A protein has these predicted regions:
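Short glycine/proline- and aromatic-enriched beta-strand/turn motifs that initiate or cap beta-hairpins
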Residues: 21-73
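Residues that define the transmembrane beta-barrel architecture of outer-membrane proteins
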Residues: 26, 64-68, 112-118, 132, ...
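Outer-membrane beta-barrel "beta-signal"
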Residues: 29-31, 193-213
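Residues on the lipid-exposed face of transmembrane beta-strands in outer-membrane beta-barrel proteins
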Residues: 32-34, 70-74, 84, 120-124, ...
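Outer-membrane beta-barrel translocator domains and adjoining extracellular loop/strand segments
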Residues: 42-50, 94-103, 148-153, 181-188
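Gram-negative (and chloroplast) outer-membrane scaffold detector with strong preference
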Residues: 73-152
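Repeated loop/turn-to-beta-strand initiation elements of outer-membrane beta-barrel proteins
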Residues: 79-82, 129-132, 161-169, 209
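Extracellular calcium-associated, cysteine-rich motifs in secreted modular proteins
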Residues: 205-254
Length: 254
């Protein structure tokens, strides 16, 4: 675990030094932080019971006290991006089905079972460009809980709160429908459907600005010479409103 935390810290430092806003200019983003696994959704049969304790962190959420997920995404176009997520956890709180369908849902520790997942996703930021940046996502993956393993179909919601154009806080909830939905949900061999929540920092990067004038190379008419935005990145040394490349006397206003 110590080595994993060091790896995440190194990634954080590297990305933090080179990050920009994710869009067609800066298409890459990396997120990392903590995740929580909640098994109540498959223990309950009624929708109201499945979501009634959505925020019951103390009783239902399994959380590792360390960085426990990493996500990398690539912007495609029109708010769409695709990515991959890897996560680890420990299952210490397992919500059991009700005996005979009545009574309370009990929570037991099945034995500190290990949890691993690897998932792919397609994400749509439906109102991009704002400080509050919500999105929906769908995808699929594979989950391991102790001796059990199976594929899942995933879907959920998320939102990123941008502190700056390159750093934000991302919150996400994902429902994972298990292909191994055994009636008894018995661990350690079964992998029941569950919710997985994520909270972490997001850094965006990937843009190229060779001359450092704040205009990305793909939009810069003079990508190797620092210039002005109003001239598409070309310089006007003498400030006479004529770019140097078209100015017969570029150092004398005329």
């Amino acid at each position: 675990m110590k080595h994993l935390n060091k790896l995440f810290a190194a990634v954080c430092i590297f990305v933090g030094l080179s990050s920009q806003a994710q869009d067609s200019n800066n298409p890459w983003a990396i997120s990392f932080g903590a995740n929580a696994v909640d098994t109540r959704v498959s223990a309950a049969t009624k929708v109201e019971d499945q979501i009634s304790q959505y925020f019951n962190v103390e009783d239902n959420w399994n959380i590792l006290p360390s960085i426990s997920y990493i996500n990398v995404t690539r912007h495609i176009s029109n708010g769409f991006s695709f990515g991959v997520t890897g996560s680890i956890n420990k299952i210490k709180k397992f919500v059991n089905t009700r005996e005979g369908g009545v009574g309370e849902y009990t929570v037991t520790n099945p034995g500190d079972f290990s949890y691993y997942s690897a998932d792919g996703l397609i994400k749509w930021n439906f109102i991009p460009g704002y400080i509050v940046d919500p999105y929906v996502h769908v995808g699929g993956g594979y989950t391991w809980i102790e001796d059990g393993n199976t594929g899942t179909v995933n879907g959920g919601l998320g939102v990123t709160f941008w502190f700056s154009e390159m750093v934000g806080l991302t919150l996400q909830s994902t429902y994972k429908q298990s292909f191994d939905e055994r009636a008894d949900r018995a661990l350690p061999n079964a992998v029941p459907s569950h919710l997985q929540h994520f909270a972490g920092l997001t850094f965006k990067f990937g843009g190229k600005d060779t001359d450092g004038d704040g205009i990305y190379d793909k939009d810069d008419a003079c990508p190797e010479v620092a210039g002005l935005k109003q001239f598409n990145g070309c310089p006007d040394t003498d400030g006479d409103g004529i770019i140097d490349g078209s100015d017969a006397c570029p150092e004398v206003a005329g």
